[in-house]
Amino acid sequence: MLKIDHISKTFAKGTVNEKKALDDISLTVDTGDFITIIGSNGAGKSTLFNSISGEFFVDTGKIILDDEDITKKPDYLRSKDIGRLFQDPLRGTAPSMTIEENLSLAYQRGKHFSLTPFTHKHHDVFVNALKDLDIGLEDRLTTKVGTLSGGQRQALTLLMATLVKPQLLLLDEHTAALDPATSIKVMKLSERIAKEHHITTMMITHDMEDALKYGNRILMMKDGKIIADIDEETKKKMTVEELVRKFTETGEANDRVLLH
């Protein structure tokens, strides 16, 4: 379970560029939840993810993950329990290393580091995991990751983030840079992995259809605050038009967030 207790974050405090990115946010995410998060650019969505993953410390409040206070825990220590995918398929992998070497690094998250002996020892584990992706990478373990397509690379990054089951998976617009067909495939794969492994998941999206289609709850953000929290029963009954209408009522709608 993730519990966020009254967190706030202000950047460039005391200057003309001062920006309150998170404003007294409180949130409880139950184990196994799949929450989609919508909001215009600058609403605080990625900043919320950054605060959870430890890219910076919040100014006030607490972040509790699986009954542990991680508020002041460095990002490299949080990475054992928190997996994250970004919009850019180039992030999250080492392009000059092979698929097998990348998986070896991911498999050692939170453990003592070694590479060559570890890779050979867990060859079968990696082959089976790649087969489960069903994108034809199981016979390409020696392929350099930098030669993969964007969709293949994002699917591999998803596997790397979940190879050792995390307490929490953060999906930060992870399909936005992919073509429509590949985006659908990666989204279905994300949903399947989250369900099969019972991984608590939070996903930022600008696609209203995806916000409704995936997950059991929707959060709407504006000006560093959560302004709406839509539960599963309400979400099931909503149409895209109703969700867009609810969003436009906040005065925050723009072309990008209305994509559907």
Model-inferred region functions:
Residues 1, 10-24, 74:
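A short, flexible loop at the N-terminus of ABC-type nucleotide-binding domains that lies
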Residues 38-40:
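The feature captures the beta-strand-to-loop junction immediately N-terminal to the Walker
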Residues 53:
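Helix-to-loop junction immediately C-terminal to a conserved catalytic motif
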Residues 61-69:
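Conserved ABC transporter NBD signature motif
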Residues 69-83, 91, 113, 119, ...:
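ABC ATPase NBD coupling module
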Residues 205-206:
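H-loop/switch region of ABC-family ATPase nucleotide-binding domains
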Residues 225-249:
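Conserved beta-strand-loop-alpha-helix hinge in the C-terminal portion
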